[in-house]
Amino acid sequence: MTRLLLALILVVSAASAQAAVRIKDIADIKGLRENQIVGYGLVIGLNGTGDTLRNAPFTEQSLQSMLENMGINVRNETTSTTNPARPTTLRTRNVAAVMVTADLQPSIGAGERMDVTVSSLGDATSLLGGTLVMTSLRAADGAVYAVAQGAVTVAGYSVGGQAQNVSQGTPTAGRILNGALVEREVQGSLHEMEFLVLELKNPDFVTATRILDAINRYAGGRYRAQIAFERDYRTIVLSKPRHIGPVRFLAEIGELTVEPDTPARVVINERTGTVVIGRDVRISTVAVTHGNLTVRVTEMPVVSQPAPFSRGQTVVVPQTVVEANEAGSQVAILSGVDLQRLVRGLNQIGLKPSGIIAILQAIKTAGALQADVIVQ
């Protein structure tokens, strides 16, 4: 049985001691975002760890097309007018088909370089030592924005023989540092925007109000005007002053600090046993007990042998032993004035992670947990 691990992360700090954060760390500028680009290519130079061409026909077709584009004939000669040329069956394990992905940063210029991620498509066992040949990277609009090429860096490894294989990490995926050359800039500029819009990464009414007040308080002394107004609890619109550039303006606004408000929330991951409890979680007075019932089933078959020369047959008699054990449990009174008391009360019962998850869900069902419970 797989043991359930517990990672109980407590966000415990007084409201007065909550750290202030910069606006640029909790809000994004609308219109300035990354764009995903992707391309299909080949990694060559593998030491026998590439695709099996019989199992990955797309790799063979790509290799033939690449060689033909370079002027290398990889087709059989035509024997007659009725027998057209057919592709030669290639036999190599040094090539792997890959998908190349990258994030195109906003305002990046043509000629700059960026990192790319290379992931195997076929049955290659490792990309270690391989080199990606020139691959075009396209965005959702179909245009080519970058070209990638270079040696692949792989963190994992995979070695083995016919009877055993040892691997660590993921050797079928890697990265190429500065492996892509940007060929086209993303359209858009801050100078063309009449209004600058801030979008909160974690939308909240209180946080949006605090950001709005901080910006207008700063702008009242710096620009002698109120420049910010809220559109909703996620969006804040800024009116840029005329005598200052957008870069300097956003730099000044981004350095302002506020105290973001965090909602009362409990996040539960049943697969890993992780429980994350927010600082503002409250619980009404409730009594909790949790029983632990363990049932063990053991099969102990008995073989019955016949007597010598009796012409009997050997018979396997099934024998099952069932044991049930119910451990005693304690009753704890949980009165959650704060998170520390809640955790202290749960620890008094001596629960495992699965028990804590079950109790939190039951308390929420009873209406005593004053927080949102998110189960992943």
From Swiss-Prot:
InterPro entries: Flag_FlgI. GO terms for cellular component: bacterial-type flagellum basal body, distal rod, P ring; outer membrane-bounded periplasmic space. It is found in: Periplasm; Bacterial flagellum basal body. Pfam families: FlgI. GO terms for biological process: bacterial-type flagellum-dependent cell motility. One of its GO terms (molecular function) is structural molecule activity. Keywords: Bacterial flagellum, Periplasm, Signal. Residues 1-19 form the signal peptide. Assembles around the rod to form the L-ring and probably protects the motor/basal body from shearing forces during rotation. The basal body constitutes a major portion of the flagellar organelle and consists of four rings (L,P,S, and M) mounted on a central rod. Belongs to the FlgI family. This is Flagellar P-ring protein 2. It comes from Bradyrhizobium diazoefficiens (strain JCM 10833 / BCRC 13528 / IAM 13628 / NBRC 14792 / USDA 110). The lineage of its organism: Bacteria, Pseudomonadati, Pseudomonadota, Alphaproteobacteria, Hyphomicrobiales.
